[in-house]
Amino acid sequence: MMSSPPSASVQQDPTIADFLAKQGETDATLLPLPGDASARRYMRLEGRGRMLMQDPSDPAGFAGFVSLAQHLTELGLSAPQVFGADPDTGLALIEDFGTQTYSVQLAAGRDESMLYALAVDALLHLHHHPQAASVQVPAYDLATLLEELSIFSHWFAPTLRPDIDPEAFDAEFRDLWREPLTLSLSGPRTLVLRDFHVDNLMELSERDGVRRCGLLDFQDGVTGPAEYDLVSLLQDARRDLEPGLEQAMLERYIAAAPDAAGGADAITRRYHLLGAQRHTRIAGVFLRLHQRDGKPGYLHFLPRVLRQMQVGLDAAGLTEVIAYLDQTLPGWRGAGPALAKAG
């Protein structure tokens, strides 16, 4: 994570100053970090090995971060330690894992297969742990998976075809997904971190085993299908993996997966179904970020997301979904470059 220059408004914010004083941090210099798609902000306490997290707009996400950070640590994984938290102001003082995200490491030429293997092993550790799902988080169930597809219906579909009735499209679209998504939930349920990708993973070189993989941005965790986080990692909307790496890492996971997962064919089937759903949802999310939230930067990734969506639909054998998209949204397959330019 790169830091920005100290912000005077942050330094003088009485709410922040009061919170830090209660944590024994009265003279810290705060360095704001770049934001992401959420309203959450992070500020590094220069030279302290600690970071201030601020998220007053999402009490559920704030509480989720605090509880899941402790839970993941108890499971033997590396999540930031929470030194203090105030739900009323949405402020938390947390451990600073430093700057070496996977994204930074990969940009510097670090061995890609080694980093991804470490992340896969961290997922395997999580999925084998009998207490992984023993935490109070929402269920990632059929209703939720279908509801997420409505983002595509209400943002992507009318962008491509302004005359479309989003509600009618959504009803038919979701009906086509209901049976395959039911199948995607047929495996064992575990803790799903949901945004398990290179921007949210750190290499903690001073730690051993799977604890070398630092976990970030897990506050939206749910209980659901194990393969979902594998999709997040290996079918990243933001970057292409080197040729053959996705398959190699999928095979690495399958070789050591819990017996309850049902073997290679069952895991692979769920992996492709969840990938198709995820990319379809993200195509809608990126347009919503642009049109509703004024964040056009994510449109840059749309061509890749639509390619991944096509591959996922084909791999999952969702022929009826493909036919419906071809009929109702002609040209959707090649819409990525034009939509990317809109930002």
Predicted features, each with a name:
Residues 1-91, 190, 204-213, 326-343:
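Conserved NTP-binding catalytic cores of kinases and kinase-like/nucleotidyltransferase enzymes
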Residues 38-147, 151, 157-162, 185-186:
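ATP-binding pocket architecture of kinase catalytic cores
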Residues 39-46, 52, 126, 177-228, ...:
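Active-site acidic catalytic loop and adjacent metal/ATP-binding pocket
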Residues 260-272:
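Acidic, serine/threonine- and proline-rich low-complexity regulatory regions
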Residues 284-343:
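ATP/Mg2+ or Mg2+-diphosphate-binding catalytic cores
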Residues 12, 16, 21, 131-139, ...:
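An alpha-helical support segment within catalytic cores of ATP-dependent transferases
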Residues 150-159, 226-261, 276-293, 305-313:
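Active-site activation/catalytic loop segments of kinase-like enzymes and analogous catalytic loops
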Residues 144, 193, 219-223, 271-276:
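Secondary-structure capping and boundary motifs in well-ordered enzyme cores
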